[in-house]
Amino acid sequence: MTMNVQPQALFAALIATFLAAASLPAVAHQAPVHEHTQLVPIPDYDLPYGPAGGAAALQAANAFLATFDETTKAQFMFELDAQERSEWSNLPAGIVNRIGISVGELSDDQRKQLFEFLASSLSEDGYRRVMDVMAAEAFLSTDSRAKRLKWNPENYWLSFYGTPSADAPWGWQFGGHHLGLNLSIDGGNVKTMSPSFVGTEPAVFTLDGIDYEAVVDMHHAGHAVFASLNDDQQAAADAGSVPEDIRTGPGKDGFVPPIIGLSTAGMTDEQKTLLLDAIAKWVTIQPDENAARRMTDIEAELDQISFAWTGGNDVNSPVYMRIQGPTLIIELLSTGGNVGQSASGLGHYHTIYRNPTREYGR
């Protein structure tokens, strides 16, 4: 999350320009000076169509789609169950090609409509998390590897599945490097955001004079649960060695890993509250209309959920967390590392949220 900055300043400055590499001391990769494409400033979280949710998302989607001709729309609109929907990735665009229409292909008005759609489709916290990921990508754009890997905040893509409708199911996907949101809407309401990936590299950085901490609050919320456990509970919660990556990321639809860790049934009420607070960091990315229902469902199955943890509270160190129950898988992985051109460019996170029973709203 961002630190010590008002929302107006945060979004106005987010990626108004990519940093000129000469404006910061070359620390991490000794990147040369690059010329960067200017971006339209990302607007504040604004809800021109009413409270965020299925109804507002429908209006915003139709307003966005109305700016395209039929030929162009065919490039980013697919059947509800199209195979393309499951072919998303968290890797840089220089490694994995994307489908959909990118931020870089949009006119100024279309970009405005895009951000209004995202605001109408996500909670304020969810919108902020998307902006933080894009800010990290702008930070990476100063790195010497940026051209090859296509680290560029214009390289995020939107696609639709099914035709946005008040009485038929449809969904949308927005993603790129370290981001893959998949929300499903039916009957005018958001039904699920499974699967959704939120990550960042770096996690702690300064962009255009604004300090960011992206995904760090998720890490700290998980560690707060672990720190509340007694010695026996911590031993039971031990996740073992930190894996190379999360187990249920892109390309792992339908895979349910074995249960590991401490059963929540053995936790105190205070510990359960901390666990629910950690879970909410992911669930509340989606609008309140579904997040509240989802948290109620999770609380009802709380004693069937397990919590596993390895690592500490340091942003720049190896950490792995898994929270898993009948309808829930959350994973967080921290590998650490320094990137970009600033000493504040620390940390590297991958996280995933899944409801194995409602993937893509099915």
Per-region residue spans from a language model:
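A cross-kingdom marker for long, charged
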Residues: 29-123, 127-362
